[in-house]
Amino acid sequence: MSLATSTTPSALTRPLLPATAARPATHWIDHIWFAPLVLTVLCGSLFFYGLNIGQLYRTETLRAILGAEFLRNGDWIVPRLYGEPLFTKPPGMYAAIALASWPFGRVTEATARLPSAVAATITVLLFYWYFRRQTGKVGGLIAAVILPLNIMWLDKAPSAEIDMLQVAWVAAAIIFLLRALEADEEGHGGGIWWMAAVLCVAGGVLTKWTAPAFFYGTAIPLLWCRGRLRLLWGRQHLCSAAVGASICIGWAVLAVSRTGWEVFYNTVSREALMRLSPAHHDRPYPWVETLAHPLILFAANLPWSVCLFWALRPSFARLWDERGRRLLQALHCWIWPNLLFWSSIPEHATRHSFPLCAGMTGMAAMVWIAWLDGRLKWPVRWIRPISVLVGMAMFWVGLKLVFLHGVVPSRNDTREPREKAAQIAAAVPESATLYLFRLKDEGIMFYYGRPVRRLHGIEHLPSSGEPLYCILEKTEWEGYDQSRPAEAVLWLRDEQGSEIVLARFTDLQPHDDGS
C-alpha cells in the first residue's frame, strides 16, 4: 500500500469531509460543552474513581516504597530501596508519586496511583486534540473515547506502575513530532514542537529508559517515507536533542556523583543488556515468544486490534484526503517498525510494548470514523455503528466497576501485606530502624511505613546499646550461629508464602560497620 502524499499547504488545510458527507452526529455533538463533558465523565470513571480501592499489588508496592523514600530522605535524584541505590528504573515515576503524596505527607494507595491517572487523562486529551485537528470534532472524540477501552488500560490505568506514565510520554512525543512536521510543511518552522517532542522523550528516558526506541522507531521510518530524513540533521531537531540529552546526562552525572560510577554503570548496563542482547540473556533466544509476541499484543488491544484488518487494505487509504492519509501513514510507522523491534529482542513482557497499543487504537479510530461517516461500509446491517460504539463504552465503564469492586480488593487476600505489616509494627518500637538482609517483600515493608535498611549480613549490624530488630528468612535464622544473643519475636509468612522471622538482637558488642 502506497501512502506517498504531496505536501502542499492547500492539501493540508482542506477539510476532512465534503460538506455533503453523511455525519453520525446530531446537533448536541456540536455544542461546545459536549466533548469536554464526555471526556470528563470517561476519564473520571475509568481513571480517578477507585484510586484508593484495594491494597497495592505486586510491584506497585516497589514504586510506592521508593516514592516514600523520596519523601523521607529528600533525595529526589537517586532511587533508594532500604538505603541502597536502585537504578533498575530512573526516578521519574518515583518522583511523580512523591510529588502527588507531598501535600498529604505520606504515600497512600491513592497518591501512588494518581500519576498514572493523570498520565492516562493527558494521553486521552492529546488524542482528542490531534485527531480533532486532523479528522474533525467527531473523529477526535471517537479516538479519545476508544483509546482507554482495552485490557491493558483496564489494569494499568490507574495503577502505581510505571507503564501508563511511559505511554503518556511516548504518545505526546510522537504527536508533537507530527505537529512539528506539519508546521515545517506549512512554512511555520516547527521548532517549538520539536522541542516539546524531545522533552517528552527525555521525560520517558527518566521514567523507563525506552522512550527513544519508540520515538525514533517511529520518526525514522516516517521521515524516510516522506523523503524528509534530512530533518534529523536539521538545526531544530539537533538543538532540541541537545537540550533533551543534557537533561538526561545531567541527572546521570548527579546520580553518579552521589553513588559512584560502578554502582550506576553495573545496574544500568545489566538491565539494558539483559533485555536487548540475546548473548546476555539468562536463557536461549525465545523463538516461540518472538513469534507469539505480536499475537499477544493484538489480544491485549482487543477489540480494537480487529479493526487493523480493514486499515491494512490498500483501498482504505484511498478513502481519505491528504490529512487523513498522512495520519494513517504516521500510525503505520508508529505500529509496525516498533512491533518488529520489540518482538525481536529477547525480553517480551507485554508491558514493555504498551506504547504500541496507543498507535493501534489510533488506527482503529480511523476505521470507526470511516464507518460512522459512511465512507466505509458497516459490516452489520441490523445495528448502527454509533450504537455499538456507545454500547462498548458503557460496557467498559461497567467492566471497570466490576474490576475495581470485584477483583482489585481480593488480589491480596492471601498475601495480607497490611495485616502482616501491622504485626511487625506492633512488635518493633516506633523509633527503631528495622533491618533486613536477603528478604524481598516490598508489600509488607511499604505498609510497615517506617525506616527500613538493608545490610549484607548480620555481622554488619551497627553497634548499639538498644535492641536491634531484623527480619530474616527462615534459612537465615536457622543458619545463624547465635554469636550475638538473639531471639525470635514473631514468625509469619511473606507475600510468597515463605516463612520469615522478626528477631531481636541484644547485648551487641561494639562493631565497626565499615561505613
Where are these regions (language model features)?
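Membrane-integral, polyisoprenol-dependent glycosyltransferases
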Residues: S2-L376, G406-V407, Q496-S498
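Short low-complexity stretches enriched in small and charged residues
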Residues: W33, N52-G54, A98, V388-A393, ...
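Short periplasmic/luminal acceptor-recognition loop of GT-C membrane glycosyltransferases, typified by
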Residues: G44, F395-S498, R504-L508
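Long hydrophobic alpha-helices with heptad-repeat/coiled-coil character
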Residues: V205, P212, R375, R381-L389, ...
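Alpha-helix N-cap/loop-to-helix boundary motif
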Residues: L328, L356, M360, S387-G391, ...
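Signature aromatic-anchored transmembrane alpha helix within multi-pass, membrane-resident enzymes
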Residues: I369-V402
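Short, solvent-exposed mixed-charge patches
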Residues: H511-S515
